[in-house]
Curated annotation (Swiss-Prot):
Primary gene name: rnc
Protein name from the UniProt record: Ribonuclease 3
Annotated catalytic residues: D53, E125
EC assignment: 3.1.26.3
Biased composition regions of type Low complexity, renumbered to the chain: 216-231
Obligatory cofactor(s): Mg(2+)
Top-level taxonomic group: Bacteria
Occurrences of domain DRBM (ranges): 163-232
Length: 237
């Protein structure tokens, strides 16, 4: 059962001037596919996801740029990745129980979509975009900064997260003048707990494969396998 938008506004600590933006942020495309008549009044949150993704990326980049003045580009990229990855954004969404407020089709509902990390992360991005359109960038920054700060503080001993994708890209571009490409080759498990399998290639050569609970995690695992193979002279499977 979906909970009320007014309740979510109170949970977020935000009063929207245009509550329709928040309604849109919580409208999954599957709901409109099932309830065609609602398209007269509602849009899906896909466009808001696009905008929210860009806003979150920018604010995360700005924070780590200011926080770590001596860090190089690779380190800054790794810190930013820790803040914007699917698992992190899904965790932010869970703090506010966002999944309980999303409009979903019955099929998505029965498959456990409200707990799916990808859906939670996408919804969080859409809510951020709605807040930006309603109140501007400063309001978004005020809302996001404590979440980002808590995430950075939670990293073990402030250890820099390893971004294997960035490491692999730098190496392959330097050695072969091409950019590694990632391809999803399998998805298994239940809808609410999927496992992705991804391979990474340089041109036609497969460098490695990896598995994970999200495409991002699987890509990182594939990049790590590729680096291990390149350094050890083995197949990256």
């Amino acid at each position: 059962m979906r909970k009320s938008v007014d309740e979510l506004s109170a949970r977020l600590g935000v009063t929207f001037s245009d509550q329709r933006l928040l309604e849109q942020a919580l409208t999954h495309s599957s709901f409109l596919n099932e309830h065609v008549e609602e398209r007269m009044h509602l849009d899906s949150n896909e466009r808001l996801e696009f905008l929210g993704d860009a806003i979150i990326n920018f604010l995360a980049a700005r924070l780590v740029f200011e926080r770590f003045p001596d860090a190089g580009e690779g380190e800054l990229t790794a810190w930013r990745t820790a803040l914007i990855r699917t698992e992190t954004l899904a965790g932010f969404a869970q703090r506010y129980n966002l999944g309980a407020y999303v409009l979903l089709a019955r099929g998505e509902e029965s498959s456990g979509a409200r707990q799916r990390q990808a859906l939670l992360a996408d919804t969080f991005e859409a809510v951020i975009a709605a807040l930006f359109l309603d109140q501007g960038l400063n309001a978004v920054r005020t809302f996001l900064l404590p979440l980002f700060e808590a995430e950075l503080a939670s990293l073990p001993d402030r250890t820099l997260p390893v971004d294997y994708k960035s490491r692999l890209q730098a190496r392959i571009q330097a050695e072969r003048r091409v950019t590694p490409r990632y391809h999803e080759i399998d998805r298994s498990g239940p809808e609410h707990r999927p496992e992705f399998t991804v391979e990474v290639r340089a041109g036609e050569e497969r460098l490695g494969t990896g598995k994970g609970p999200s495409k991002q995690a699987a890509e990182q695992a594939a990049a790590r396998a590729a680096l291990d193979a390149l350094e050890g002279g083995t197949d990256g499977r």
